[in-house]
């Protein structure tokens, strides 16, 4: 008997009819003699509606206001959990909705972006013993002052991963509106391939680079606690989706632009490779030696993704240093993706999440009025393109190919980041689709 966490996203619970269609999916897992815990998001669009309502009545620039903001936003998941519990009960399946305070899911005091400190599992274990399916409202927690907190956007993914970790689940299944993780956005690349298996680190890079299927925090948690995760479609429940795992079942190499002559050689010539100081040698077919030479550390581009949910913040300040401005930007847990210092310590650029715009507008206006900064501007017409794989940083040819292609396409690159497994380019958002299409074909991603 396995313990499976099933998480259903906003499109999966968008209306009553879709909620009813989740019942057979849950029943199918029970039929395998598995225990099931369910985590749900708010219905699609509901959280945005609640955010709009809050913004209509409040400036949201005080801590006490964000506490009430979290209470309002948490209501979406509560409705979904109760409706799904009712739908299961209608089919004679024992189920009960559970809210964060009932477990509890204890968090810190960072309203709207809370971090979970611990989860008490006694009630969940009791329900499983009684064969009652717990339907947990995702996205929410409760702090030591017994105030509701929320975990930030994508927080229901995080809830599911945390529950899986706390309960030592065998697997965490994330149900969305797509059939898994693809090598590129199928809306841009119609022939993009579904990835059957992907390792944690690759998925973490994908999620943090804009792939919207999973939240990066959820991926980080299942990686930390070594819990397999599957991404599945609610609308194609028989599709196997994508398995995110640490197990050694993932193909080691998926070549992209290796030398054809070396890879296609049909020679059977033997070559000598020294084994040790004694002079003993192995006899290897030349094609295997060439494969080791060109494949084992060859750069591999596995997939490409984009993120348009970004905000460029430019700050002019004579009196504040770069670090002081950066510290100011990160106030209220605003996350920085890129940082850039230009024009002799006078102008500083930061790339953050677009969702932080209102917070930063209030903060920077106050700083400008107090003469801490001279001016600031926002630019929302930016995006990142990220290529993810192996050996990225070590292959100069990769960067040359990318820059040559972008020059040919008249694409302007504002900033660039390189790591061993990822290259990220900051470009204008109008160029995203064209760039993805051309780079996908350039590297023959498959």
From Swiss-Prot:
Pathway: Amino-acid biosynthesis; L-lysine biosynthesis via DAP pathway; (S)-tetrahydrodipicolinate from L-aspartate: step 1/4; Amino-acid biosynthesis; L-methionine biosynthesis via de novo pathway; L-homoserine from L-aspartate: step 1/3; Amino-acid biosynthesis; L-threonine biosynthesis; L-threonine from L-aspartate: step 1/5
BP-aspect Gene Ontology terms: diaminopimelate biosynthetic process; homoserine biosynthetic process; lysine biosynthetic process via diaminopimelate; threonine biosynthetic process
GO cellular component, one term: cytosol
Broad EC category: transferase
Documented EC number(s): 2.7.2.4
The keyword Acyltransferase belongs to this UniProt entry's keyword annotation: no
UniProt superkingdom: Bacteria
GO MF annotations, alphabetized: aspartate kinase activity; ATP binding
UniProt keyword terms in alphabetical order: Amino-acid biosynthesis, ATP-binding, Diaminopimelate biosynthesis, Kinase, Lysine biosynthesis, Nucleotide-binding, Transferase
InterPro entries: AceGlu_kinase-like_sf (IPR036393), ACT-like_dom_sf (IPR045865), ACT_Aspartokinase (IPR054352), AKii-LysC-BS (IPR041740), Asp/Glu/Uridylate_kinase (IPR001048), Asp_kin_monofn (IPR005260), Asp_kinase (IPR001341), Aspartate_kinase_CS (IPR018042)
Record's catalysed reaction(s): L-aspartate + ATP = 4-phospho-L-aspartate + ADP
One Pfam family per UniProt: AA_kinase
Residues covered by the RPE1 insert domain: 250-294
Family: Belongs to the aspartokinase family.
PANTHER family documented for this protein: ASPARTATE KINASE, ASPARTOKINASE
Protein name as catalogued: Aspartokinase
UniProt source species: Rickettsia prowazekii (strain Madrid E)
């Amino acid at each position: 008997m396995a313990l499976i966490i099933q998480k259903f996203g906003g499109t999966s619970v968008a209306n009553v009819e879709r909620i009813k269609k989740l019942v057979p999916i849950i029943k199918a897992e029970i039929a395998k003699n598995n225990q099931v815990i369910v985590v749900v998001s708010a219905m699609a669009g509901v959280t945005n509606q609640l955010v709009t309502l809050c913004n209509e009545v409040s400036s949201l620039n005080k801590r006490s206001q964000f506490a009430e903001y979290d209470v309002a936003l948490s209501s979406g998941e509560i409705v979904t959990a109760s409706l799904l519990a009712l739908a299961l009960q209608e089919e004679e399946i024992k189920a009960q909705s559970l809210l964060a305070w009932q477990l509890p899911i204890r968090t810190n005091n960072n309203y709207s972006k809370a971090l979970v400190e611990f989860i008490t599992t006694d009630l969940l274990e009791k329900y499983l013993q009684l064969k009652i399916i717990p339907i947990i409202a995702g996205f929410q927690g409760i702090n030591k002052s017994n105030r509701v907190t929320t975990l930030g956007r994508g927080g229901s993914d995080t809830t599911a991963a945390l529950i899986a970790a706390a309960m030592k689940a065998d697997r965490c299944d994330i149900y969305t509106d797509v059939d898994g993780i693809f090598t590129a956005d199928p809306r841009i690349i119609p022939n993009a391939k579904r990835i059957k298996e992907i390792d944690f680190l690759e998925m973490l890079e994908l999620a943090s680079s804009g792939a919207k299927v999973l939240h990066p925090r959820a991926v980080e948690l299942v990686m930390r606690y070594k819990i397999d995760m599957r991404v599945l479609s609610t609308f194609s429940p028989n599709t196997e989706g994508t398995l995110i795992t640490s197990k050694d079942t993932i193909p080691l190499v998926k070549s992209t632009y290796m030398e054809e002559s070396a890879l296609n050689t049909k020679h059977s010539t033997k070559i000598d490779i020294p084994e040790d100081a004694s002079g003993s040698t192995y006899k290897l077919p030349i094609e295997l030696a060439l494969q080791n030479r060109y494949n084992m550390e060859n750069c591999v581009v596995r997939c490409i993704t984009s993120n348009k949910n970004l905000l460029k913040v430019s700050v002019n300040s004579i009196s504040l240093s770069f670090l002081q401005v950066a510290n100011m930007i990160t106030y209220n847990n605003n996350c920085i993706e890129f940082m850039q210092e230009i024009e002799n310590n006078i102008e500083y650029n930061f790339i953050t999440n677009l969702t932080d715009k209102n917070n930063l507008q209030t903060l920077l206006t106050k700083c400008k009025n107090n003469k801490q900064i001279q001016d600031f501007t926002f630019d929302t017409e930016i995006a990142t393109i990220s290529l993810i794989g192996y050996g990225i940083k070590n292959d100069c040819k990769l960067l040359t190919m990318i820059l040559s292609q972008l020059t040919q396409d008249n694409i302007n690159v504002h900033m660039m980041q390189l790591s061993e497994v990822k290259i990220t380019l900051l470009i204008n958002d109008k160029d995203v689709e064209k760039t993805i299409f051309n780079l996908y074909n350039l590297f023959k991603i498959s």
